[in-house]
Curated annotation (Swiss-Prot):
Organism expressing this protein natively: Yersinia pseudotuberculosis serotype IB (strain PB1/+)
Pathway: Purine metabolism; IMP biosynthesis via de novo pathway; N(2)-formyl-N(1)-(5-phospho-D-ribosyl)glycinamide from N(1)-(5-phospho-D-ribosyl)glycinamide (formate route): step 1/1
Reaction catalyzed: N(1)-(5-phospho-beta-D-ribosyl)glycinamide + formate + ATP = N(2)-formyl-N(1)-(5-phospho-beta-D-ribosyl)glycinamide + ADP + phosphate + H(+)
Molecular function per GO: ATP binding; magnesium ion binding; phosphoribosylglycinamide formyltransferase 2 activity; phosphoribosylglycinamide formyltransferase activity
Protein's name in the database: Formate-dependent phosphoribosylglycinamide formyltransferase
GO biological process: 'de novo' IMP biosynthetic process
Length: 393
């Protein structure tokens, strides 16, 4: 039976978040609701989750020694990775020393880069995926593209939010695509994956929870991508019963192979009744922010319940709902927001992440809406997001 100690007291139950962005912030809030002591860690100061944590630290999370020292200092009961760019080999070592890594260290190691999870899905589990090759030199990259054929997609094996990702339609784009991929990796330049283009009707995120009371699924989430990053997401995404069943079967296989308790964001391509595995993250997913308004328990609440070893019970979905990102472009270290009075009309909500600065384009918030149908929910969310005016000195 779980015992939770009181935060800031000797018997506190401590949760260390490795990654303190907007997703980590919502996880921190859910931890706070249960009286857990929250320690937020990121590579920069004043990250969103740090605003709602009991303590925070700024370290290079790719530095295994620094990570080990911080864990020894804070003595967390749960280590919760919220990003890919972490010294996962150190997480494996820490787990062997008795630390509880969420969902487990092997899951974070395999999913920190696209190669580990692709080989697990395609080669070990024999799941349907796109054709693919890996390369770590320009010559190997050029050959891999020739093997896959045009059009194809190149991505750093370790990146997020579309960084370093590009669509290659002809040979003239090869050099630029290689150089862009080398700039976009979370751990610097290095290995890339080249994927054949999959013809699909739509993409979904199937939030899949592995918990003490079994495997649970949220309703499928549809989303629109632009420049490799999501712009709107909605729930539920309409799909055939056969496709949904196949999606659940694939997702269950993947999360069972990864192991541990927690929420996983499984990305899938759907074409008619056929489902193709794309990627998985062993943590809440950005497209899943729609669950802040669409369900009785958000993806963040579900993640916390699962990793604490608590039962999930019943997940209720309230009907057509959507999220739309607030994505301004400016340079400022003193960001201000206006227009909330206009944005908050009808069944809408706004989340402003509290990021300390912006240099170029950056996701600073999200608008959420519920409506009678998906199309209306998306339009209402987009309109609400567009009504937020962002400025800075």
């Amino acid at each position: 039976m779980l015992t939770i100690g009181t935060a800031l007291r000797p018997g506190a139950t401590r949760v260390m978040l490795l990654g303190a962005g907007e997703l980590g912030k919502e996880v921190a809030i859910e931890c706070q609701r249960l009286g857990l002591e929250v320690i937020a860690v990121d590579r920069y100061a004043d990250a969103p989750a740090m605003h709602v944590a009991h303590r925070s630290h700024v370290i290079n999370m790719l530095d295994g020694a620094a990570l080990k020292q911080l864990v020894a200092q804070e003595k967390p009961h749960y280590i919760v990775p919220e990003i890919e760019a972490i010294a996962t080999d150190m997480l494996v070592e820490l787990e062997k020393m008795g630390q509880h890594v969420v969902p487990c260290a092997e899951a974070t190691r395999l999913t920190m880069n696209r190669e580990g999870i692709r080989r697990l899905a395609a080669e070990t589990l024999q799941l349907p995926t796109s054709s693919y090759r890996f390369a770590d030199t320009d010559s190997a990259f050029f050959q891999a593209v020739r093997d896959i054929g045009y059009p194809c997609i190149v991505k750093p094996v370790m990146s997020s939010s579309g960084k370093g990702q590009s669509l290659i339609r002809s040979e003239e784009h090869l050099q630029a695509a290689w150089e862009y991929a080398q700039q976009g990796g979370r751990a610097g330049s290095g290995r890339v994956i080249i994927e054949g283009l999959v013809h699909f009707d739509f993409e979904i995120t199937l939030l899949t929870i592995r918990a003490v009371d079994g495997i649970h699924f949220c309703a499928p989430i549809g989303h629109r991508q632009e420049d490799g990053d999501y712009r709107e997401s909605w729930q539920p995404q309409a799909m055939s019963d056969i496709a949904l069943q196949r999606a659940k079967e694939i997702s269950a296989q993947v999360v069972t192979a990864l192991g541990g308790f927690g929420l996983f964001g499984v990305e899938l391509f759907v074409c008619g009744d056929d489902v193709i595995f794309s990627e998985v993250s062993p943590r809440p997913h950005d497209t899943g922010m729609v669950t802040l308004i669409s369900q009785n328990m958000s993806e963040f609440a579900l993640h916390v319940r699962a990793f604490l070893g608590l039962p999930i019970g019943t997940i209720r979905q309230y009907g057509a709902a959507a999220s739309a990102v607030i994505l301004p472009e400016l340079t400022s270290q003193n960001i201000t927001y206006r227009g909330l009075e206009t944005a908050l009309i009808g069944d809408t909500q706004i989340r402003l992440f509290g990021k300390p600065e912006i240099a170029g384009q950056r996701r600073l918030g999200v608008a959420l809406a519920v409506a009678d149908n998906i199309e209306t929910a998306i339009e209402v969310a987009k309109k609400a997001a567009g009504n937020i005016e962002v400025s800075g000195e």
